[in-house]
């Protein structure tokens, strides 16, 4: 059944069938191929997956993100980051990195981050004399920092398939997220110094910068509040997601006073459409996961690896390579939902903590978002910058090297995630 399902899924993907539908059809064909199982099992698995209580967190986190990024708040955050980094060599480039960290605590989506930030910052960076390809590469890679900063949609999905606490995953992502941001800022500085890009004179006084920081503080506090509420057990992930929406509405209505009824409706529709896409993938992955479990494929793989490969280091490296390969053609939600049930038993076999595995998977699949030839944020950023894909790829390698270094560190240094 598993082999038939994989063949059908690959064929449907080559025909450009949407991932969610491809997963459901592949699982259905596999069940029919068995000959003894009713097709209603697929429908039952799809329905059961939608009854998960933690699943309610997804639409609310997405709505909170669209509410906060759609108005004055987004402009304030961008203005703060640009003025704060302007004095640095490569400051306009570093602004993208810092903005990704700040926006990551609000949006929770790397693709949305790449589009929202790139459309504003890339034209501004080009006006400051930075080449379009470098601007695109910087935006494509920096957007992925988003998936490490709470609230992270990929981490919520991994918790669904692994049983790991969402709070533990959110906390574990903070240090790797900061390290990735710092390494990308270093790349921006190094490239600027090596190529002779001058720092930009700042027109902002310290008093004005402090004023901008105070205006943006309520938004920056959101990820901090999420961590505190989850870490100390004050609320469940779903309750925190609802509170995030209430917090976002309060800021937009009472603090920034820029929320209109039309924008609210547009934001609700936008969040609903994004949630629908993810939910379809989740439902399809539930059916595929049932077929894999019925065939005992994850356990058989874990047993085979344990019997034939004695070194945990080799196993972890193989897992990383497979995740990188899968992350190139597949978006993060389906990749996590497909690989999670396979790798969790394998991680348990070699004593790899599930939280550490979750961070490995998120970073790996995040790198896949900008890895040629099929990288979502790479294509988005190149399109915004009007840069040929080949030129953007050449500028990508210093950022890629830093991300791979962090990936290896997270894979083999548990203290980076288990603190």
Curated annotation (Swiss-Prot):
Residue ranges crossing the lipid bilayer per the database entry: 5-25, 26-46, 53-73, 102-122, 144-164, 170-190, 210-230, 234-254, 274-294, 309-329, 332-352, 360-380, 396-416
Cellular component, GO, one term: plasma membrane
Membrane topology: Multi-pass membrane protein
Keyword Membrane: yes
Superkingdom classification of source: Bacteria
Family: Belongs to the YiaN/YgiK family.
Record-linked NCBIfam families: dctM
Protein name per the record: Uncharacterized protein y4mL
The species this protein was found in: Sinorhizobium fredii (strain NBRC 101917 / NGR234)
Source species taxonomy: Bacteria, Pseudomonadati, Pseudomonadota, Alphaproteobacteria, Hyphomicrobiales
């Amino acid at each position: 059944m598993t082999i038939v399902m994989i063949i059908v899924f690959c064929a449907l993907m080559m025909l450009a069938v949407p991932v969610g539908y491809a997963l459901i059809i592949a699982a259905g064909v596999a069940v029919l191929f068995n000959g003894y199982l009713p097709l209603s099992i697929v429908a039952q698995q799809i329905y059961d997956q939608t009854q998960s209580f933690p699943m309610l967190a997804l639409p609310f986190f997405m709505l909170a993100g669209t509410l906060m990024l759609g108005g004055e708040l987004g402009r304030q955050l961008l203005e703060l980051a640009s003025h704060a980094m302007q004095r640095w060599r490569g400051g306009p480039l570093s602004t993208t990195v810092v903005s990704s960290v700040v926006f990551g605590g609000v949006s929770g989506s790397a693709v949305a981050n790449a589009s929202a930030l790139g459309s504003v910052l890339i034209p501004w960076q080009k006006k400051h004399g930075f080449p379009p390809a470098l601007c695109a590469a910087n935006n494509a890679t920096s957007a992925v920092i988003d998936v490490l900063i709470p609230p992270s949609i990929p981490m919520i999905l991994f918790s669904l398939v692994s049983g790991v606490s969402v709070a533990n995953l959110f906390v574990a992502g903070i240090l790797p997220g900061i390290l990735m941001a710092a390494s990308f800022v270093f790349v921006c500085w190094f490239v600027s110094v090596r190529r002779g890009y001058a720092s930009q004179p700042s027109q902002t006084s310290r008093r004005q910068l402090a004023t901008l920081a105070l205006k943006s503080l309520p938004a920056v506090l959101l990820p901090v509040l999420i961590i505190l509420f989850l870490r100390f057990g004050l609320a469940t992930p779903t309750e925190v997601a609802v509170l995030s929406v209430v917090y976002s509405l309060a800021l937009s209505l009472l603090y920034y006073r820029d929320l209109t009824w039309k924008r609210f409706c547009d934001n609700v529709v936008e969040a609903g459409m994004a949630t629908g896409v993810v939910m379809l993938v989740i439902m399809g992955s539930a059916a595929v996961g049932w077929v894999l479990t019925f065939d005992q494929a994850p356990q058989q793989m874990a047993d085979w690896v344990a019997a034939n490969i004695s070194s945990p280091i080799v196993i972890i490296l193989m897992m990383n390579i497979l995740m990188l390969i899968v992350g190139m053609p597949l978006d993060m939600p389906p990749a996590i939902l497909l690989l999670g049930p396979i790798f969790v038993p394998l991680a348990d076999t070699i004593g790899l903590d599930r939280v550490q595995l979750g961070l490995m998977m998120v970073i790996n699949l995040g790198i896949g978002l900008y890895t040629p030839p099929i990288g979502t944020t790479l294509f988005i950023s190149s399109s915004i910058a009007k840069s040929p894909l080949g030129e953007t790829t050449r500028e990508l390698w210093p950022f890629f090297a830093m991300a791979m270094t962090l990936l290896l560190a997270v894979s083999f240094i548990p203290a980076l995630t288990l603190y």
